[in-house]
């Protein structure tokens, strides 16, 4: 799924088509199909194989700096069921015109941005947006660690 978001006069708008994407837009890809990857490739000149790299479940966190883009991969926490925790890679591309996120599944880390709950979030402030995503990732990890700690304490008390 490919969605395009952009701040206009302080309001976050979701554009209906990728053709509406303009400078300062955020392109969010969730489990993209080959056609969506090709569209993003045409818009940004990011090679398709690099876009696909972010979809590799074994991809480790790293940063790549190229002439036309910066590619950041971070592992984000995922809760599967009531007590099964995992981490999946989230790829973030920063180009001159666009901010692109790509993940195999819906990322809880991005919900506050998609629902416009972050008061200081703007799609065109790409560095700030990157740091805000990293901060939200840390907050989620801490929340999940606290849940694990509470469950561990409960189990230890029962023993």
How would you describe each model-predicted region?
Residues 1-159:
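Peripheral, non-transmembrane regulatory/ligand-interaction domains of membrane transport proteins
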